[in-house]
Amino acid sequence: MSKTLYEKLFDAHVVHEANGETPLIYINRHLVHEVTSPQAFDGLRAMGRSVRQPSKTVATMDHNVPTDSRDLAGSGEMGRVQMVELAKNTEQFGITLYDINHINQGIVHVMGPEQGLTLPGMTIVCGDSHTATHGAFGALAFGIGTSEVEHVLATQTIKQARAKKMKIEVRGKVRDGISAKDIVLAIIGKTTMGGGTGHVVEFCGEAIRDLSMEGRMTVCNMAIELGAKSGIIAPDETTFAYLKDKPYAPKGKDWDEAVAYWQTLHSDEGAEFDTVVTLEASEIEPQVTWGTNPGQVIGINQPIPNPAEMSDPIERQSAEKALAYMDLPHSIKLTDVAIDKVFIGSCTNSRIEDLRAAAAIAKGRKVADGVQALVVPGSGLVREQAEKEGLDKIFIEAGFEWRLPGCSMCLAMNNDRLAPGERCASTSNRNFEGRQGRGGRTHLVSPAMAAAAAVYGKFVDIRNLELH
């Protein structure tokens, strides 16, 4: 019987499945951070339980860490307490921790892949909704809640219902200047933010295959933003080349055996999907969100939609509310909209290729007057590599702030946030009301588009700019 990649991954991890009950599946890798883990560890202590497989759990600090210093208290008392608790809990339960001063510290979804903790065929969980990022490697990866974090720590398993199967194919090749972020925003614009609800999405097609692993991670990272449980991409030679020689990747004969297995991880010919969506890559423009969810997105040269022209009353009401919050009129182009801040970072776009793309725009230019622009590498290793390449100097000379690794302005859980009414061009994944700070207005874009907005003080079409 033909199977989808998702079915192969799920079936390979079923520990127990009884009639009428939710299947119990095995978890290969558990990634932990400071925000969703304290209560889980407290639960273990209260019941006198240990962590069943400490070697399969790795922790880092990311959400609360300040990016202008390595002071634990730099983001406030709550952040300090959570980071101190994580250090205490990981030491007590024998779990590896990349703390705030470790070179491997970083955003959990950047750190995992670059260490080789993320491998094809795995099941991976983390108490964070963007765990889908790891699906770029042909892994089944999804976010879990704090009570589930405790369950995985104690049992290395989790109850998980089977999801519906969705295929999103991006046909052909993208045009110059189009990034993975533009691809996934265009996908969400077509499916809407609820189009993938109840599904695990497999991304495929020539445009997806052409992406680097970092680009694929950007796409899978935002699968959750179309409502999906997770997103996956079948592994291939690009995957294997990325993983080769990573610290936690198999070595020697084990590597050869692993690759032989990984090559079987693809959807069979004739495998059936519940939903199929197709996009033409050549039609994708640089994308910018105009509203308060990632599905409210347009190409840079398109006008903001007029809610009155929307036939669906719910969609119309949502658009009206979004435009009111964003303080934007309909029918104008976003190239007419000025911005106050720029954020280049997050688990979506803080890897070395993202920083190179932004630096190519920033080089030889200056941040516009009145604009604050932050560049926040996704990990200590990304920061180290960027500095080896001189990217930090490019950003600093252009007037960007070169920060330390962390989640930063993606979410208002640290000191990097928007003030009420401020408008931000952001490479993050969510533009919800208040996401980057109470009353803040977020526009999601690619790293190159964000850098260009910083330089020009407004949104521009990067395809018209000379790269350096």
Swiss-Prot record:
Query: What family classification does the UniProt entry report for this protein?
Result: Belongs to the aconitase/IPM isomerase family. LeuC type 1 subfamily.
Q: Drop me one GO molecular function for this one.
A: 4 iron, 4 sulfur cluster binding
Q: Name the source organism.
A: Pasteurella multocida (strain Pm70)
Give the pathway. Amino-acid biosynthesis; L-leucine biosynthesis; L-leucine from 3-methyl-2-oxobutanoate: step 2/4
Show the segment(s) annotated as Disordered. Answer: 53-74
User: Where is [4Fe-4S] cluster annotated to bind?
Assistant: C347, C407, C410
**Record key words, sorted:** 4Fe-4S, Amino-acid biosynthesis, Branched-chain amino acid biosynthesis, Iron, Iron-sulfur, Leucine biosynthesis, Lyase, Metal-binding
> What does this gene product do?
Catalyzes the isomerization between 2-isopropylmalate and 3-isopropylmalate, via the formation of 2-isopropylmaleate.
The organism's taxonomy opens as: Bacteria, Pseudomonadati, Pseudomonadota, Gammaproteobacteria, Pasteurellales
Needs which cofactor?
A: [4Fe-4S] cluster
Give the EC number(s) under which this enzyme is classified: 4.2.1.33
Cofactor annotation comment: Binds 1 [4Fe-4S] cluster per subunit.
Ranges annotated as spanning the membrane: none
| Record protein name field | 3-isopropylmalate dehydratase large subunit
